[in-house]
């Protein structure tokens, strides 16, 4: 009852569009007064969810936001394509809560970027409005297609750049960082 908003980040939701996975979770938790939305930003959906939660709280629109990241990409992996089976299933959650003005804990900063030009390197062709599921859909279009080497190279470069930018922006040295929980660079 004390959750104001549920954000679920996933590239493999329970259903394609309706109902949202967040609404299913809202019902199961019995928090009927909470807003609920799915957020899709591929592998970074959970991070975008945290940033969205932070901004809802900063705007005063919410005080307690449940952010969930969940993937079951094994269900859409082409197990015959060695470049595309480097995924694992899993889920994690965080409760983001408005803190007192005197507290210094929480989300300090974030740096969100995307690589739209790389869409061809990680794609599932069927299932969207551009190419709906149909009896004549080519079987390979039902599965995730990935250029593993390209995706890995991009992810490692992006992570290194992001750490550098965030450290510079916040006056933090690399030595002061205790933990980095990175994206799984496949």
Identify the role of each PLM range:
Residues 43, 71, 184:
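Catalytic nucleophile serine of serine hydrolases
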Residues 9, 40, 65-71, 96, ...:
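Short beta-strand segments
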Residues 9-17, 177-186:
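Glycine-rich phosphate-binding loops at beta-strand->alpha-helix junctions
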Residues 11-65:
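Conserved catalytic cysteine-centered active-site region
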Residues 53, 58-82, 90-94:
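Phosphate-binding/catalytic loop of phosphoryl-transfer enzymes
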Residues 1-4, 161-178:
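Phosphate/pyrophosphate-binding loops at sites that engage ATP/ADP/AMP, CoA/4′-phosphopantetheine
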Residues 73, 80-153, 157, 161-164:
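Condensing-enzyme catalytic core mediating Claisen C-C bond formation in acyl metabolism
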């Amino acid at each position: 009852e004390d959750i104001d908003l549920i954000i679920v980040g996933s590239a493999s939701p329970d259903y394609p569009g309706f109902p949202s996975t967040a609404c299913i979770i809202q019902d199961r938790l019995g928090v009927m007064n909470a807003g609920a939305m799915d957020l899709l930003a591929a592998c970074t959906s959970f991070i975008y969810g945290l940033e969205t939660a932070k901004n809802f709280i900063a705007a005063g629109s919410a005080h307690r936001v449940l952010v969930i990241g969940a993937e079951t990409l094994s269900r859409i992996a082409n197990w015959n394509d060695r470049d595309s089976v480097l995924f694992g299933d899993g889920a994690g959650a965080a409760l983001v809560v408005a803190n007192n003005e005197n507290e210094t804990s929480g989300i300090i900063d974030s740096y969100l970027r995307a690589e739209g030009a790389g869409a061809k390197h990680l794609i599932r062709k069927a299932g969207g409005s551009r190419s709906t599921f149909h009896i004549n859909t080519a079987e390979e279009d039902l599965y995730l297609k990935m250029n593993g080497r390209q995706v890995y190279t991009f992810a490692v470069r992006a992570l290194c750049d992001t750490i550098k930018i965030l450290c510079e922006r916040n006056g933090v040295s690399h030595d002061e960082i205790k933990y980095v929980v990175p994206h799984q660079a496949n």
